[in-house]
């Protein structure tokens, strides 16, 4: 019988690849997405449409509003940087977001009797977010096994799976394509137009386009004219 796993699933390139990997590894995927007050819903709407076709047994959308706290260009009226990927943590970082997301995933996993959680973080082609690093994931995994009834009573050991963490974006894309991922049904842009065209200039678009270029392929999503 397949083991249950909770997959953090935004509808973006990385999380979609992560879902496909979990399925290929024999897990029974339970997808979890978040409506957290993000400035656009294009990614979330794709997640809603894709989760079940990708094999999710259930798809839970958790709603809360991080706009009340602000502090990020993804949740507040702060301009999304378009100058390229820098060395500092950018304003698109959402304070403690992965800790919040993983905490919800941990709660659902414990309820399901699952001990495996997948998250599509990457520490190579990424924007420098602190909650995407291997040491952060290791720390959260330790906490998960100390902070839950299932972990303390020894029913099992929680594992946070990060299959993309040491891959380049090109390697992620190649892996996904080998598993049948349709990247035309994913969204990565931080600042899309009203008709959901990707801007081509934010960190996320730049990393995505770089990945497709290095993989020798054309990104199937639509971009603002002249930005692809």
UniProtKB/Swiss-Prot annotation:
Disulfide bonds: none annotated. Pathway: Purine metabolism; 7-cyano-7-deazaguanine biosynthesis. It comes from Geotalea uraniireducens (strain Rf4). ATP binds at residues 9-19. GO terms for molecular function: ATP binding; ligase activity, forming carbon-nitrogen bonds; zinc ion binding. The keyword Ligase applies. Signal peptide: none annotated. HAMAP family: QueC (MF_01633). Its EC number is 6.3.4.20. SUPFAM superfamilies: Adenine nucleotide alpha hydrolases-like. It catalyses: 7-carboxy-7-deazaguanine + NH4(+) + ATP = 7-cyano-7-deazaguanine + ADP + phosphate + H2O + H(+). This is 7-cyano-7-deazaguanine synthase. It comes from the Bacteria. One of its GO terms (biological process) is queuosine biosynthetic process. Belongs to the QueC family. Keywords: ATP-binding, Ligase, Metal-binding, Nucleotide-binding, Queuosine biosynthesis, Zinc. It holds the Pfam family QueC. Zn(2+) binds at residues 189, 199, 202, 205. Binds 1 zinc ion per subunit. Its cofactor is Zn(2+). The gene is queC. Gene3D superfamilies: HUPs (3.40.50.620). Catalyzes the ATP-dependent conversion of 7-carboxy-7-deazaguanine (CDG) to 7-cyano-7-deazaguanine (preQ(0)). NCBIfam families: 7-cyano-7-deazaguanine synthase QueC.
């Amino acid at each position: 019988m397949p083991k249950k796993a909770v997959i953090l699933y935004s509808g973006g390139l990385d999380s979609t690849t992560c879902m496909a990997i979990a399925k290929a590894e024999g897990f029974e995927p339970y997808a979890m997405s978040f409506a957290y007050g993000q400035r656009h819903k294009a990614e979330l709407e794709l997640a809603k449409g894709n989760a079940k076709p990708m094999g999710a047994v259930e798809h839970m959308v958790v709603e809360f509003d991080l706009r009340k706290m602000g502090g990020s260009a993804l949740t507040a009226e702060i301009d999304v940087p378009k100058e390229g990927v820098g060395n500092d943590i950018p304003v698109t970082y959402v304070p403690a977001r992965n800790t919040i997301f993983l905490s919800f995933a941990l709660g659902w996993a414990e309820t399901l009797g699952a001990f495996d959680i997948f998250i599509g973080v990457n520490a190579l082609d990424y924007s420098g977010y602190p909650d995407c690093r291997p040491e952060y994931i290791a720390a959260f995994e330790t906490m998960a096994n100390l902070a839950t009834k299932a972990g303390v009573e020894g029913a099992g050991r929680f594992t946070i799976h990060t299959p993309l963490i040491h891959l380049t974006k090109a390697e992620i894309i190649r892996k996904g394509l080998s598993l049948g991922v349709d990247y035309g049904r994913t969204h990565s842009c931080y600042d899309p137009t009203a008709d959901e065209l990707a801007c081509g200039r934010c960190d996320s678009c730049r990393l995505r386009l770089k990945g497709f270029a290095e993989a020798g392929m054309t990104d199937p999503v639509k971009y603002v004219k002249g930005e692809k």
